[in-house]
């Protein structure tokens, strides 16, 4: 990693946020935690993390509401949706909304960290495919 990856963690459960913060920070990532999707939506206009990991069910705006807002503002930003309700409907709704991946709770911390790394790697690969207009390839 040339720079510290920034991961936003969105969950109304403080213990989940704490566990993810510690695990991701141990891997050298910078974390910012939010207890609601509403607070993230307000901040997205000013900042953008590398990856967002969000609970699906929270008071106020849901993780799916947040996902819709992110797709509008930052369509390539990878979002991992997690929920204690590991039902098929939640998984399907997450993928249909454009989630990078779905993480059912309870989750293995190492699996969650690995998933965040994969999401960040995917985002970097996607950015690498896009060349700025002043660097567009010209046929030889």
For the regions a protein language model found, what residue spans apply to each?
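C-terminal output helix
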Residues: 87-89, 103, 107-117
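Short hydrophobic/Thr-rich beta-strand motif most characteristic of the beta2 strand and flanking loop
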Residues: 28-35, 40-43
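Receiver (REC) domain active-site loop signature in two-component systems and cognate sites
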Residues: 58
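Two-component/phosphorelay signaling modules centered on CheY-like receiver
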Residues: 14-32
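Active-site residues of response regulator receiver
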Residues: 55, 83
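Active-site beta3 strand of CheY-like receiver
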Residues: 47-53
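Acidic catalytic/metal-coordinating carboxylates
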Residues: 35-36, 62-65
């Amino acid at each position: 990693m040339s720079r510290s990856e920034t991961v936003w963690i969105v969950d109304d459960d403080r213990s989940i946020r704490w566990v993810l913060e510690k695990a991701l920070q141990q891997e050298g990532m910078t974390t910012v935690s939010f207890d609601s999707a509403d607070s993230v939506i307000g901040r997205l206009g000013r900042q953008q993390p590398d990856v967002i990991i969000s609970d699906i069910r929270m008071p106020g705006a849901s993780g799916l509401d947040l996902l819709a807002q992110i797709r509008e503002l930052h369509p390539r930003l990878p979002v991992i949706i997690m929920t204690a309700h590991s039902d098929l409907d939640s998984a399907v709704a997450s993928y249909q909304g454009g989630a990078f991946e779905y993480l059912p709770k309870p989750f293995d911390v190492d699996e969650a960290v690995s998933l965040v790394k994969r999401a960040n790697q995917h985002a970097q690969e996607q950015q690498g495919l896009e060349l700025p207009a002043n660097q567009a390839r010209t046929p030889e």
